């Protein structure tokens, strides 16, 4: 067991598209020592005993009310480390899936501050958190594995 095991993060995230737009949810994050509102893909932590495709469906439903149709399609994985106060390190791995949803409009759930469809140009301007880099790289040219690190 690694020294990071107690704080590791395993996540599953949904890429939901409608035409040329992608669905994002608003969150409040601690970045660079301050609180910042970010636009993130719907998703979050995989719970104990949960499979990745189950987690992405649950998180999408909790955050937007949308229901996944069928099995999500794997797109890419991002992993890295996050260094927080006092130099503690946390390893994280996030899996991203294209999902098809049952018809309906997304509505912000209790865990998020809002929902918004972003165009490619809006994504380039709005996605500024360090962990957004891999998604933007994937959009620009593909790839299936990305590594990054960030510091609070």
Please name every model-derived segment:
Residues 1-23, 98:
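Conserved N-terminal beta-strand and adjoining loop/helix that marks the start
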Residues 4-8, 35-38, 87-93, 112:
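A generic structural micro-feature
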Residues 16, 96-100, 116-119:
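Short, well-ordered beta-strand micro-motif
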Residues 21-62:
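Conserved Nudix-box catalytic region and its N-terminal flanking loop in Nudix hydrolases
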Residues 22, 103-107:
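Short helix-loop capping/hinge motifs at secondary-structure junctions, enriched
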